[in-house]
């Protein structure tokens, strides 16, 4: 779905084709309309997948493990919170309301990391009856990598903004795609969460 927005943005020259900054595709019209529409669909589908996974774990577990049952419900909330953050990113463009957009992105990726860690723990907890150890290890590695990359992206972005403002205190923070900077940690974090 978002591939169409990406292709259109690259064709118009609004994003870098190798490492596109995700929010850049959602700032210019008509890409903004397509980006919002497709990201809303993705957010809804994410909520559906999170709920289906919750239901599957709840059904397989029933009442045999009360800790797993409680943790599964908490993980459902983390997943739904992450998908809600995706709604915020979709509907509040970066140039319109930057605070809400960044809050939504932080909520989406932060809650997504928590959800991934929770799913890894659930997979380990359900081993050997309902889950294989291989998939549990894969989920664990991906979750840890996602958390590390999330903190790297947040830390480097914060450090870069502070460094820029210490040199140019009166200028707004430059947008990465206008200066050909590659937001590599954010890109890797995005890819690792899928």
Tell what function each PLM region has.
Residues 1-58, 71-85, 91-94, 103-124, ...:
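Early transmembrane alpha-helices of polytopic membrane proteins
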Residues 58-71, 97, 127-135:
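Membrane-interface helix-boundary motifs at transmembrane edges
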């Amino acid at each position: 779905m978002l591939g169409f927005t990406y292709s259109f943005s690259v064709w118009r020259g609004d994003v870098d084709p190798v490492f596109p900054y995700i929010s850049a595709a959602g700032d210019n019209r008509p890409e903004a309309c397509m980006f919002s529409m497709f990201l809303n669909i993705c957010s809804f589908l994410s909520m559906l997948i999170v709920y289906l996974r919750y239901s599957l774990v709840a059904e397989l577990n029933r009442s045999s493990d009360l800790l797993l049952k409680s943790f599964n419900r908490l993980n459902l909330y983390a997943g739904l919170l992450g998908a809600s953050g995706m709604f915020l990113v979709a509907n509040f463009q970066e140039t319109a309301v930057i605070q809400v957009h960044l809050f939504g992105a932080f909520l989406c990726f932060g809650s997504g990391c928590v959800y991934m860690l929770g799913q890894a723990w659930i997979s380990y907890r359900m081993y050997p009856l309902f889950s294989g150890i291989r998939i549990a290890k894969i989920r664990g590695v991906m979750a840890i990598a996602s958390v590390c990359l999330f903190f790297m992206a947040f830390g480097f972005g914060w450090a870069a903004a502070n460094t820029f403002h210490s040199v140019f205190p009166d200028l707004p923070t430059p947008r990465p795609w206008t200066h050909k900077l590659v937001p590599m940690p954010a890109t890797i974090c995005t890819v690792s969460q899928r």
